[in-house]
Amino acid sequence: MSLLLGLTCLFVGAPPAGAAVNNITLIVPTTPATGADILARLLAQQLNTKLGQVVVVENKPGASGNIGNDFVARAKPDGATLLIASTSFALNSAVNPNLPFDPIKDFAPITLLGTGTLCLVTPSTLAPNNLTEFIALAKSSQLDYGSPGNGTPQHLAMELFKMEAGVNLFHIPFKAAANAVNDLTGGHVSAMIVPMHTVLPLVKAGRLKMLAVMSKERAELAPNVLTFKEQGYPKLQVDVWYALLAPKGTPAGLVQELNTQVMQILKAPNVVSQLSVHGIEANPSASSTLADLLKMELGRWTQVVKTAQIKAD
């Protein structure tokens, strides 16, 4: 991508030896209209304007995101191919340690892009009106929960909840999040942990109850809903996160310049507000901070997978 070319020209007017000369491609390992895709398209638009270069988004879904992840891991480390990763990036490796790539060794972290809030929701027809009542019901009767599939953030977050709350909920995996939410709304599933913005309209319409959020602080879009920490579960802090990664071996100078440019974009008020509409909080970071996050997430979820005895499909 001419990302390297464009960034370099900002300072010296000419590309260095070995600079990339192609367009920038942001690989999204999910389908369109997901959080990662929405963020990628906004970022591409801003980079187009900022760098004066062509920045395109290419969706490569499949295998829980591993097709796109592996594509970037094998790409030439010249800054022309970048990955929009999300929480699943670490979860996949925790569930399946035999992937063709290493999430730590095969990628160069650039920056955290943003975070989203997860929440625990139940059907409006289910009796509990708060977390304490829900846990009591779960301990006295057999409840279940839905998720978009084995090893997804929603699945593992609920397994973590089960461990911390000491309850046993039966897992019902669906092929898609929309299907799971539909069954939840219809009362066919007892509970779900989901990205808050996807169910907030149903909560406001009285069709679902939101019992807790997994963020560190209360969510701006639902300020009256308590965090798990406020309700006695400090370890239940889990965010959906999005990050920008490059193939391992990408020059350190390019990684730093990408970090600088993207950080400026994500701090712009118009970008912050556009992401907020989709339930994403802009949260750029140093590349070292992202590296630490990836290691922490992989360790955390590997332990959850082991304890819950979760196996790859």
Please provide the spans of the model-predicted regions.
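An extracytoplasmic/periplasmic, membrane-proximal ligand-sensing/linker region
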Residues: 23, 163-164, 252-313
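A ligand-binding cleft/hinge motif common to bilobed small-molecule-binding domains
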Residues: 89-98, 155, 160-164, 191-225
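Hinge/capping helix and adjacent helix->loop/strand transition within the periplasmic-binding protein
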Residues: 74-79, 94-179, 228, 241-274
